[in-house]
Amino acid sequence: MRTLNTSAMDGTGLVVERDFSVRILTACFLSLLILSTLLGNTLVCAAVIRFRHLRSKVTNFFVISLAVSDLLVAVLVMPWKAVAEIAGFWPFGSFCNIWVAFDIMCSTASILNLCVISVDRYWAISSPFRYERKMTPKAAFILISVAWTLSVLISFIPVQLSWHKAKPTSPSDGNATSLAETIDNCDSSLSRTYAISSSVISFYIPVAIMIVTYTRIYRIAQKQIRRIAALERAAVHAKNCQTTTGNGKPVECSQPESSFKMSFKRETKVLKTLSVIMGVFVCCWLPFFILNCILPFCGSGETQPFCIDSNTFDVFVWFGWANSSLNPIIYAFNADFRKAFSTLLGCYRLCPATNNAIETVSINNNGAAMFSSHHEPRGSISKECNLVYLIPHAVGSSEDLKKEEAAGIARPLEKLSPALSVILDYDTDVSLEKIQPITQNGQHPT
């Protein structure tokens, strides 16, 4: 008997020690995730507040709205759930309903802002002239207001009126569920109607829009890259054919194969960039929303494949929230924001003063292309920088390209209809960072 009791005590102690180790690891991981989310999104907000040229770009309004929604996820949602995960129960009592409303509101706002950014990028690329006229600060604020209003309506009203909860099968079950939610946990089961409707509005419609817009963006970029490559080959071909030997006879000229390889690398780079944007978003949120629609149809004793326990479901909840820590890296790490971050953190003092060689290709409606190159020191921020990026930003202004064209070399080429300006660095790392409307006279609009 004594041996059995000792073994039982040792087994219990081992379980307790293992449980304590798991809690410590969980606390470290969740703390790191929360801190990274806070740091990344705070840097985005601080950069826009600190640097005026970032505030002057309409497209950055959407990035700021996204950063605010992700920052609210890190402040109003993640810490409370992290404490509950570590403690093993919900210690905040009746705050549960308010927390659930914040969770739905902030997560929905983050996803809808991602959707708005994709639509904004598509408009800027497909109709640059119309975009420049109609995408005013007022229009941007209207789009942002719609996203946030929809997020509030889908969260606070149903939660405060208890429309989101599944109806209990009996009065005793209802009392037990209510007591459990307010004391021990905050994992209220959603009703089937609310789970499906909220998932459709918060995720499935936005992800469908994002897939369509980014697919069309890739097709437009692919078409323009191939068009530019064809014009480059024609220019090189014409130049080579003009070369003559000592006898005055032209040298046989051939099509350069390097242009085909460079075009393929550019297309691959664009595809990788868009794949990262969509892949990260889908991998983070899709598992949660699939389970969110399936679990309301599972009974209390179901053992079906997708009827998982609450602990496994919580893992996918954290996967979705982790998207808020990745958004600043994906959507705010263009050249302007990187320079702003370096200045805010003082990193440019520690980094070597390397120059980034950039080639700008501007093509107007009459088919005239202007090629120019300049070197931009890393860590420097221009006082008046009005560039707006395609991924995740698009349309640029006239002042920067006018300066570039003043030092550039003009090369007349064949006919080309849409105006396009693409930034290509010398190692074929394509970011497609500018699309600049050009008038028929070859001048940028003022």
From Swiss-Prot:
Distribution of this protein across tissues and organs: Detected in caudate, nucleus accumbens and in the olfactory tubercle.
Keyword Endoplasmic reticulum set for record: yes
InterPro entries the UniProt entry points to: Dopamine_D1_rcpt, Dopamine_rcpt, GPCR_Rhodpsn, GPCR_Rhodpsn_7TM
GO BP term (any one): dopamine metabolic process
Signal peptide: none
Disulfide bonds: C96-C186
Keyword set, alphabetical order: Cell membrane, Cell projection, Disulfide bond, Endoplasmic reticulum, G-protein coupled receptor, Glycoprotein, Lipoprotein, Membrane, Palmitate, Receptor, Synapse, Transducer, Transmembrane, Transmembrane helix
Lipidated residues (S-palmitoyl cysteine): C347, C351
Cytoplasmic compartment segments: 50-60, 120-138, 219-272, 338-446
UniProt-annotated location(s): Cell membrane; Endoplasmic reticulum membrane; Cell projection, Cilium membrane; Cell projection, Dendrite
Transmembrane region(s): 24-49, 61-87, 97-119, 139-163, 193-218, 273-299, 313-337
SUPFAM superfamilies to which the protein is assigned, alphabetical: Family A G protein-coupled receptor-like (SSF81321)
Top-rank taxon: Eukaryota
Family: Belongs to the G-protein coupled receptor 1 family.
Subunit description: Interacts with DNAJC14 via its C-terminus. Interacts with DRD2. Interacts with DORIP1.
Role, per record: Dopamine receptor whose activity is mediated by G proteins which activate adenylyl cyclase.
Protein name: D(1A) dopamine receptor
